[in-house]
């Protein structure tokens, strides 16, 4: 039996949170299809949603606009629900080049991808959890609306073993091969198995740290246990186990054979069409490619690009929506769309771009027309499939405003902080005025965010402030997610005082140390200076008691006027609440941690420890060393760094390099 959702937190709902939780829960119980949680920055939206989930006790899918925010939400939910299944479902590609054809230059681009093994495991773990447990929360990106294997076929392929079962060893090995597991007697890795006499060791595709041991005696399952694949230590015996497939795209043999029959029929029709149109090159190309795929499917059960035949594999008719993560959800599931003003347009835009690329592939004989049904959901299909929904945003978009049966406001922060004071200053002196403001904030150990309209302006501004001895960094779209997280962490740690950006200083950027947000050229009406953009950007200063937003403008646009009026409305409500309850505002205190994997790291024994705790322990270890021991340790770390570099493991090499620099810079000073 599944556990109940159990929220673990040292905080109790306060401010506007109790009434918001009550209204959301009442709305869900009354059967409202759509609700909006309009929550200002720092009001505890995540905590409010966590409380609502605990009260309604329903499995939940949370959609985020990007991987960074998904990782942040995942970390927080794992802290709130340590006893429940909190899962992470994002795109597993580190690099993805879709299959495409450019007719103008007659260039065919083959699909090329690099799959992140760890994220693939987390995706499989997510679908396993939602099929086995009611107490599941999945944090996902728009990857959730892309085609996934058919849930019915996937669940039919499960391998169930119970202690005492009569089963031939060869039958188990055959079933593992059907699940696309490979035999590897030398090294036990994810989605592999090894055989040693009557013992079969299986490393499940969805497992991160545990493998399964099946002990047979005379065609009878004598023992089933979980063990540590690294140390071989037995962890626990169990009466039964279920082994899940290596991929979501596995299909029972009989369905594969019927799929091949359907592909043959479609191929024959399409070849005839191409011949009549005198497209002989396309005809020959399509026949050769499709027959090769069919041969692979017949022999191995899969082929490269098998998802292009997903219409037949999942038994759908032409034009029907593909099976997605939403199809794996139980009927009583709850959907939460975070930063909905960004996520909703994303959900609507995925289908069209995918369709245009595939139509070209079909037209020029690279794919059968049925490949068009390997696609993300259209927005109207998503709406039909979506369970009861809660939108979360500080600035809901027109869709949420139109659809919502109820808007629940979360204006008051538990810390008593009020929205930043807003000031409008002239554009003519904006750079010099900003320079004096930055120096004031830096002297108080506070940080500044500056947003510009163009890349050129951001670069020039960064250069100018650097010349005037301001510690400044520039955040732009070419910086990848990991580096972006590092820059934000360095800003919080005080490595520099000012961060310049264009459109990157908005949703979900959680930096309590920021006391000033400066918006240059605020009167240039447009996407970057719309009412929503201004409210989101100004909100970045709302986590600090000295929070202030300066808008540099020569006139007040309609967007500025509406944004300032909304901010003033919120300030009045917040001040009135503070006065009534005698609350003195105080800045949010938040430790600087790594966000992916919930600020957790594995020790060699496979147990979770806090990242900050590990760093503190390491520092204490180095401080206790003699100079000779320290020199030896540094040499060892340098060897480790070069070893990683030689193996092209550049991220690991960079991490060791940073560690060496940290020891030399900080700990040697302590020695002196």
Swiss-Prot record:
Q: Which Gene Ontology terms of cellular component type are present? A: cytoplasm; excinuclease repair complex
Q: Where is this motif: Beta-hairpin?
A: 92-115
Q: What InterPro entries does UniProt report for this protein, alphabetically?
A: Helicase/UvrB_N, Helicase_ATP-bd, Helicase_C-like, P-loop_NTPase, UVR_dom, UVR_dom_sf, UvrB, UvrB_inter
- Listed GO biological process terms: nucleotide-excision repair; SOS response
Named from the GO MF annotations, one term is: ATP hydrolysis activity
Query: Where is this chain's protein located in or outside the cell?
Result: Cytoplasm
Residues of the Helicase ATP-binding domain: 26-181
- What keywords are assigned to this protein? ATP-binding, Cytoplasm, DNA damage, DNA excision, DNA repair, Excision nuclease, Helicase, Hydrolase, Nucleotide-binding, SOS response
Q: Which residues form the UVR domain?
A: 631-666
Q: What main location does UniProt list? A: cytoplasm
- Quote the PROSITE patterns the UniProt record gives: HELICASE_ATP_BIND_1, HELICASE_CTER, UVR
Residues where ATP binds: 39-46
Which ranges carry the Helicase C-terminal domain? 430-592
What family does the Swiss-Prot or TrEMBL record give for this protein?
Belongs to the UvrB family.
Question: What job does the chain carry out?
Answer: The UvrABC repair system catalyzes the recognition and processing of DNA lesions. A damage recognition complex composed of 2 UvrA and 2 UvrB subunits scans DNA for abnormalities. Upon binding of the UvrA(2)B(2) complex to a putative damaged site, the DNA wraps around one UvrB monomer. DNA wrap is dependent on ATP binding by UvrB and probably causes local melting of the DNA helix, facilitating insertion of UvrB beta-hairpin between the DNA strands. Then UvrB probes one DNA strand for the presence of a lesion.
Q: How does it assemble?
A: Forms a heterotetramer with UvrA during the search for lesions. Interacts with UvrC in an incision complex.
Comment, domains:
The beta-hairpin motif is involved in DNA binding.
Name recorded for this polypeptide: UvrABC system protein B
């Amino acid at each position: 039996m599944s556990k109940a959702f159990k929220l673990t937190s040292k905080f109790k709902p306060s401010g506007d949170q109790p009434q918001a939780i009550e209204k959301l829960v009442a709305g869900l119980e009354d059967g409202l299809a759509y609700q909006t949680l309009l929550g200002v920055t720092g009001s505890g939206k995540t905590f409010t949603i966590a409380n609502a989930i605990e009260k309604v006790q329903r499995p939940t899918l949370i959609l985020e606009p990007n991987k960074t925010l998904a990782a942040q939400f995942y970390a927080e939910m794992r802290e709130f629900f340590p006893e429940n299944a909190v899962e992470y479902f994002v795109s597993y590609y580190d690099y993805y080049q879709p299959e495409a054809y450019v007719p103008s230059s007659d260039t065919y681009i083959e699909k090329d991808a690099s799959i992140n093994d760890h994220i693939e495991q987390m995706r499989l773990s997510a679908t396993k959890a939602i099929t086995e447990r009611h107490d599941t929360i999945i944090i996902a990106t728009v990857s959730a609306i892309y085609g996934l294997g058919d849930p019915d076929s996937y669940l039919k392929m499960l391998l169930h073993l119970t202690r005492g079962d009569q089963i031939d060893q060869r039958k188990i090995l055959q079933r593992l091969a059907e699940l696309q597991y490979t035999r590897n007697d030398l090294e036990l890795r994810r989605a592999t198995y090894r055989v040693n006499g009557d013992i079969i060791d299986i490393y499940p595709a969805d497992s991160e740290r545990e493998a399964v041991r099946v002990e047979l005696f005379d065609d009878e399952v004598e023992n089933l246990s979980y063990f540590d694949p690294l140390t071989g230590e037995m962890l626990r015996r169990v009466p039964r186990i279920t082994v899940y497939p290596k991929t979501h795209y596995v299909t029972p043999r009989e369905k594969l054979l019927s799929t091949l029959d359907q592909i043959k029929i479609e191929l024959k029709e399409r070849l005839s069409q191409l011949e009549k149109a005198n497209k002989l090159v396309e005809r020959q190309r399509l026949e050769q490619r499709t027959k090769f795929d069919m041969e692979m499917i017949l022999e191995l059960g899969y082929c490269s690009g098998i998802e292009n035949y997903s219409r037949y594999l999942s038994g759908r008719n032409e034009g029907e929506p593909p099976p997605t993560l939403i199809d794996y959800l139980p009927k009583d599931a709850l959907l939460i769309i975070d930063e909905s003003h960004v996520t909703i347009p994303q959900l609507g835009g995925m289908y069209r771009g995918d369709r245009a690329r595939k139509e070209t592939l079909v037209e020029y004989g690279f794919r059968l027309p049925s490949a068009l049904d390997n696609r993300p959901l259209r927005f109207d299909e998503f709406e039909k499939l979506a369970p009861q929904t809660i939108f979360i945003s500080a600035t809901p978009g027109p869709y949420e405003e139109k659809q919502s049966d109820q808007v629940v406001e979360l204006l008051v922060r538990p810390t008593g902080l009020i929205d930043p004071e807003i000031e409008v200053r002239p554009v003519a002196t904006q750079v010099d005025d900003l320079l004096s403001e930055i120096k004031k904030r830096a002297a108080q150990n506070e940080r500044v965010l500056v947003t510009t309209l163009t890349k050129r302006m951001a670069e020039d501004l960064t250069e100018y402030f650097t010349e005037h001895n301001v510690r400044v960094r520039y955040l732009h779209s070419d910086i990848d997610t990991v580096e972006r997280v590092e820059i934000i962490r360095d800003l919080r740690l005080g490595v520099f005082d000012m961060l310049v950006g264009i459109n990157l200083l908005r949703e979900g950027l959680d930096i309590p140390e920021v006391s000033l947000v400066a918006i240059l050229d605020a009167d240039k009406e447009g996407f970057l200076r719309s009412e929503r953009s201004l409210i989101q950007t100004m909100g970045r200063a709302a986590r600090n008691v000295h929070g202030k937003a300066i808008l540099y403008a020569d006139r007040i646009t309609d967007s500025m006027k509406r944004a300032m009026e909304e901010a003033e409305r919120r300030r009045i409500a917040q001040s009135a609440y503070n006065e009534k309850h005698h609350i003195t505002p105080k800045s949010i205190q938040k430790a600087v941690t790594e966000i992916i994997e919930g600020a957790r790291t594995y020790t060699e024994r496979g147990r979770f420890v806090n990242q900050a705790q590990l760093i503190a322990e390491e520092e204490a270890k180095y401080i206790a060393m003699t100079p000779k021991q320290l020199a030896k340790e540094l040499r060892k770390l340098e060897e480790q760094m070069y070893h990683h570099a030689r193996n092209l493991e550049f991220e690991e090499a960079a991490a060791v390099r940073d560690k060496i620099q940290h020891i030399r810079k900080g700990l040697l000073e302590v020695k002196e």
